[in-house]
């Protein structure tokens, strides 16, 4: 019913919408909206596929399949990461970055981050973080998974993604507290993933790498901070580009959270946008909300550099980078409330089950939901996999 509502609102709004596509849009309005709806169809297909696999394999085998995919992605990402340190060929990269023009990895005086085969380091972390609880569920049965779990955790740490690290720590802590209160018994194994993450952070310190500065003769035309690596915009920029992984991740968290939620730049931008717009009851439709947001985003993020107005993502369709805000503008208060009620019922059911498997799937889901505050705006493959695994838990019950 929820996905049907999203689809209906989008189709109704699309019929009466007069599209004004950004300059660098790569598809027509019809194609763009169709892709949004196809994404919903793909989301349903993944849930169905995971559930259908249970007709051929037991639950733990399905989780092993998913975890092995995560291990493989992690290993490939680490190979890519070390290619810049030990100077061997990285994988071919032919897709644009978030800025739209190139995927910048090797930049003078910038710290090396683990991209893997993704467009952004945070995309890699968002994809891997939900798999960590599944790995440690398997580790309760076979100790070898403790060792294998180091690979995705190290890959996340070297991505230096605050979204991945914060969501993983808070998600597991939240689930651990709830299960401790419910069972009146603290299980140390529940927080082992956090211990592994902290350990990997210190290991990652020895694997940090900063690209060397350019020759001084190249500045100008290049900016001074590319020829002198001791120049930083502020303390946050200094922490971000520190070779120390611990400083890069955890000091940045401290500096950002001092400013409250508005310390996260994207949330600050979204707060300003919400305050400008009328209350959304039924929403603007999937994709259409992004088209409406893009001009305002340009206005909110433009900068005056030496008397010239510079836009962050000129001529592009901009992402909300927040699922909940995207749902609010795409499907209105009605759609957002339906989604939150659905999630609450799922989490409540897992909590009431209270068993070991429910804990790890609960953690998996909470990690995903936390990441949606800071990264990604669409119903993702990992969320579909998580819901599919939950259906296996509820297979003989009415969800």
Which positions does each model-derived feature cover?
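Transmembrane alpha-helices of multi-pass inner-membrane enzymes
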Residues: 172-173, 186-193, 342, 360-399
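Long extracytoplasmic/lumenal interhelical loops at the membrane interface
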Residues: 102, 254-331
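Transmembrane signal-anchor hairpin modules in multi-pass inner-membrane enzymes, especially those
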Residues: 1-18, 64, 143, 185-190, ...
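Alpha-helical transmembrane segments of multi-pass inner-membrane proteins
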Residues: 63-93, 105-110, 115-181
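Hydrophobic transmembrane alpha-helices and their immediate junctions
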Residues: 173-177, 181, 185-186, 316, ...
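Membrane-interface micro-motifs in multi-pass membrane enzymes
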Residues: 36, 100-103, 111-128, 319-323, ...
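A membrane-periplasm/extracellular boundary helix in multi-pass inner-membrane enzymes
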Residues: 84, 179-257, 272-276
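N-terminal hydrophobic segments of proteins, predominantly signal-anchor/transmembrane helices
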Residues: 1-46, 366-368
């Amino acid at each position: 019913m929820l996905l049907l509502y999203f689809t209906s609102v989008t189709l109704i709004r699309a019929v009466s919408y007069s599209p004004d596509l950004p300059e660098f849009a790569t598809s027509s309005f019809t194609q763009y909206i169709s892709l949004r709806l196809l994404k919903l169809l793909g989301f349903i297909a993944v849930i169905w596929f995971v559930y259908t696999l249970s007709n051929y394999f037991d639950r733990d085998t399905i989780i092993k399949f998913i975890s092995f995919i995560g291990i493989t992605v992690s290993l490939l990402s680490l190979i890519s990461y070390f290619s810049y340190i030990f100077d061997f060929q990285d994988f071919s990269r032919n897709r644009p970055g978030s800025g739209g023009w190139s995927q910048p990895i090797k930049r003078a005086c910038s710290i090396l981050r683990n991209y893997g085969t993704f467009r952004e380091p945070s995309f890699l972390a968002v994809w891997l973080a939900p798999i960590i609880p599944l790995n440690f569920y398997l580790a309760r049965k076979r100790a070898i998974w403790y060792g294998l779990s180091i690979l995705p955790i190290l890959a996340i740490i070297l991505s230096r993604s605050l979204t991945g690290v914060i969501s993983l720590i808070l998600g597991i802590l939240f689930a651990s507290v709830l299960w401790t209160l419910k069972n009146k018994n603290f299980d140390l194994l529940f927080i082992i993933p956090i211990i592994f993450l902290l350990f990997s952070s210190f290991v990652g310190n020895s694997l940090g790498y900063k690209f060397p500065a350019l020759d001084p003769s190249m500045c100008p035309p290049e900016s001074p901070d590319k020829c002198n690596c001791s120049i930083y915009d502020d303390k946050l920029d200094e922490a971000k580009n520190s070779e120390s992984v611990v400083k890069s991740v955890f000091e940045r968290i401290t500096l950002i959270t001092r400013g409250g939620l508005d310390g996260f730049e994207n949330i600050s931008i979204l707060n300003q946008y919400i305050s400008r717009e009328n209350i959304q009851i039924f929403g603007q439709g999937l994709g259409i909300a992004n088209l409406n947001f893009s001009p305002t985003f340009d206005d909110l993020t433009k900068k005056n550099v030496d008397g010239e107005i510079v836009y962050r993502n000129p001529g592009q369709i901009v992402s909300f980078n927040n699922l909940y805000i995207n749902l609010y503008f795409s499907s209105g208060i009605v759609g957002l409330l339906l989604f939150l009620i659905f999630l609450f019922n799922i989490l409540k059911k897992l909590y009431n089950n209270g068993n070991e498997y429910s804990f790890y799937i609960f953690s998996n889901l909470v990690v995903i939901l936390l990441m949606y505050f800071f990264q990604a705006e669409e119903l993702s493959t990992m969320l579909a996999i998580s819901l599919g695994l939950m259906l296996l838990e509820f297979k003989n019950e009415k969800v």
